[in-house]
């Protein structure tokens, strides 16, 4: 009976003190339940859990980084585990158990979508602040990586400046051909330099004879430079094509679509009925506008295809990266 009183003390304070009948019935039922061994084990485990919870709450008050008692133990294991810590260290997860793998997948998937939602809201606030500050020039947001140019003194590669690369490439090739085919032979003829090693070959293919006076070093330099520049241009074009394939087809890499409710203006025109009194003609008042509730005044809404990322692949279930294909 002493055990009953000690065990029932912290629970009786939740019941109103004047309800003696409820206390008596509860103590009677509690005494009968103590007779079974299974219920006694459940009770001891319950009290042990409460003591551990009280200890953990005390420790969490002293340290701000201590985990809460109500958190799932799977979150603790997933938080302490990291498959890729950095570009240098990659941990092997082949020895993990199935339950542990599922917990880590669930935890990381939730974190990914939480970060994507935070990015979406931050972008909306950024557009709202730009509209409030009167910044009308909107730069096209593109988070795809910029490929550095292989050709010196040229800006990073993108689909916008691809024409600049074509003009630069063709200009360099034309300049090298003019230098090796016309300028260098003319200078060598005037200076009395050059050799006759190519004379028979030039005569056999019916080319101008002044090409036979070209120095072999100049000829090899011109041909090699043209080949290298052509190869680099092919690499640049392939990078542009790969960048376009990674971009979302609907929003073109911006992550946003035009709001259909406000027609990309960010404001709605309030239409009020016009009433006339006694047939008098009065000038109409200016229409009133309010901020669009659909896009919060930004004029843009989230692209549902890429989930505001601008990338064509927004899910881990993409058939292009299927490891079992």
Curated annotation (Swiss-Prot):
Looking at the keywords, is Isomerase present?
no
- Renumbered to this chain, the Low complexity biased-composition regions fall at 53-71
Q: Where is the transit peptide?
A: 1-54
CXXCXXXG motif repeats mapped onto the chain: 259-266, 303-310
**The organism's place on the tree of life at top rank:** Eukaryota
Q: Tell me the ranges holding the CXXCXGXG motif repeats.
A: 248-255, 292-299
Subcellular location(s) of the protein: Plastid, Chloroplast membrane
Keyword annotations of the record:
Chloroplast, Membrane, Plastid, Repeat, Transit peptide, Transmembrane, Transmembrane helix
Residue ranges, annotated region (CR-type-like): 226-317
Q: What residue ranges are annotated as transmembrane?
A: 164-184, 217-237
Q: Which GO terms describe its cellular component?
A: chloroplast; chloroplast membrane
Where is the stretch described as Disordered?
A: 53-77
- What is the purpose of this protein? Involved in chloroplast differentiation in fruit flesh.
> Which miscellaneous remark does the UniProt record hold?
Its sequence is related to the DnaJ family but lacks the J domain. The CR-type-like region is similar to CR-type zinc-fingers.
| Record family assignment | Belongs to the orange-like family.
- What protein is this chain from? Protein ORANGE-GREEN, chloroplastic
- The protein's organism comes out as Cucumis melo
The gene designation is: OR
């Amino acid at each position: 009976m002493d055990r009953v009183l000690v065990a029932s003390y912290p629970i009786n304070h939740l019941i109103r003190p004047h309800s003696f009948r409820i206390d008596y019935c509860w103590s009677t039922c509690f005494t009968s339940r103590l007779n079974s061994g299974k219920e006694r084990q459940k009770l001891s485990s319950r009290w042990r859990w409460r003591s551990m919870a009280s200890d953990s709450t005390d420790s969490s008050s002293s340290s701000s980084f201590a985990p809460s008692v109500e958190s799932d133990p799977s979150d603790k294991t997933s938080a302490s585990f990291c498959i890729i810590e950095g570009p240098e260290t990659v941990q092997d997860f082949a020895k993990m158990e199935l339950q542990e793998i599922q917990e880590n997948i669930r935890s990381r998937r939730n974190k990914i979508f939480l970060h994507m939602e935070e990015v979406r809201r931050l972008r909306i606030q950024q557009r709202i602040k730009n509209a409030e500050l009167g910044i009308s020039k909107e730069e096209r947001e593109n988070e795809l990586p910029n490929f550095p140019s292989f050709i010196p003194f040229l800006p990073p590669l993108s689909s916008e400046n691809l024409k600049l690369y074509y003009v630069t490439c063709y200009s360099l090739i034309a300049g090298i051909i003019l230098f090796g085919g016309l300028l260098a032979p003319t200078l060598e003829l005037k200076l009395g330099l050059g050799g006759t090693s190519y004379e028979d070959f030039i005569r056999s293919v019916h080319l101008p004879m002044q090409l036979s006076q070209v120095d072999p070093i100049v000829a090899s330099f011109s041909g090699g430079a043209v080949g290298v520049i052509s190869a680099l241009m092919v690499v640049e074009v392939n990078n542009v094509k790969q960048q376009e394939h990674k971009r979302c087809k609907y929003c073109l890499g911006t992550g946003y679509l035009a709001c259909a409710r406000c027609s990309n203006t960010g404001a709605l025109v309030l239409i009020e009925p016009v009433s006339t009194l006694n047939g008098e003609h009065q000038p109409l008042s200016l229409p009133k506008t309010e901020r669009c509730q659909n896009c919060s005044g930004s004029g843009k809404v989230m692209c549902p295809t890429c989930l505001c990322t601008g990338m064509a692949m927004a899910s881990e279930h993409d058939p292009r990266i299927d490891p079992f294909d």
